Amino acid sequence: MAKKVEKLVKLQIPAGKATPAPPVGPALGQAGINIMGFTKEFNARTADQAGMIIPVVISVYEDKSFTFITKTPPAAVLLKKAAGVEKGSGTPNKTKVATVTRAQVQKIAETKMPDLNAASLEAAMLMIEGTARSMGFTVTD
């Protein structure tokens, strides 16, 4: 018989840098997860993606064992890295802070494709372009 999921915990943690310190430790402790076991496994799995923020969904079972799925980094993080800026615009409709090309948007869309509910690469690119515009980025050809 399959184990019954008791809780789902969603976190965004820098790749390879999960520690028992807040906010990771308390979130896992409340769910009854072995914190050191999770941090070691997460850091090992994400060591090759250093510098990125990785969303993770942790399934906690009734016997307090757990499994987790790592997702692709958020589109905003990938866009900031591509544009080389620290943060987006506070007033995106008035102040444009960076420019990204369609080629960069396409690369980000290809990376994000498994996590997006887009039927095609073009649809995924439109989603990423929308995120870029809402951050105060200009999309150019």
From Swiss-Prot:
Q: What function does this protein fulfil? A: Forms part of the ribosomal stalk which helps the ribosome interact with GTP-bound translation factors.
Supply the name of the protein: Large ribosomal subunit protein uL11
| Description of how the protein assembles with itself and partners | Part of the ribosomal stalk of the 50S ribosomal subunit. Interacts with L10 and the large rRNA to form the base of the stalk. L10 forms an elongated spine to which L12 dimers bind in a sequential fashion forming a multimeric L10(L12)X complex.
Q: What family is it from? A: Belongs to the universal ribosomal protein uL11 family.
Checking Pfam families in the record gives: Ribosomal_L11, Ribosomal_L11_N
- Any GO BP annotation: translation
PANTHER family, per the entry: 60S RIBOSOMAL PROTEIN L12, LARGE RIBOSOMAL SUBUNIT PROTEIN UL11M
Any one GO CC term of this protein is: cytosolic large ribosomal subunit
Position of the signal peptide: none
Q: Which SUPFAM superfamilies match?
A: Ribosomal L11/L12e N-terminal domain, Ribosomal protein L11, C-terminal domain
> Which keywords are on file for this protein?
Methylation, Ribonucleoprotein, Ribosomal protein, RNA-binding, rRNA-binding
The domain of life for this entry's organism is: Bacteria
How is the protein modified post-translationally, according to the record? One or more lysine residues are methylated.
Q: A Gene Ontology molecular-function term?
A: structural constituent of ribosome
